[in-house]
């Protein structure tokens, strides 16, 4: 049985392409339960402070308390990683409206829409 669902906000060791280290940070689960059930993996998008310079495709997180986030944050749809589900800790979840917007932005990036 999967532990995580699309739309969950998790804390994970997010990898960086420009460093050999990983930093523990919030991320959004965008994969379906099938990936976790078959391979114990999650596809996640970076969540970053809304104070950082915005990127095209960023999605605001409106309900910080429900997402388990302490400060204004955005989902950075251009930054995706594959994480072992055992390394993730659930913090909360984003709204259905925000998840739909994230899905639309991902679709644009991979030309599904």
Give the positions of each predicted feature.
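An N-terminal domain-cap segment
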Residues: 1-3, 20-21
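C-terminal terminal-subdomain/extension
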Residues: 2, 64-113
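Short, charged beta-turn/beta-strand-edge "cap" motif at the junction between a beta-strand
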Residues: 15-19
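Compact nucleic-acid interaction/catalytic patches
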Residues: 20-24, 29-63
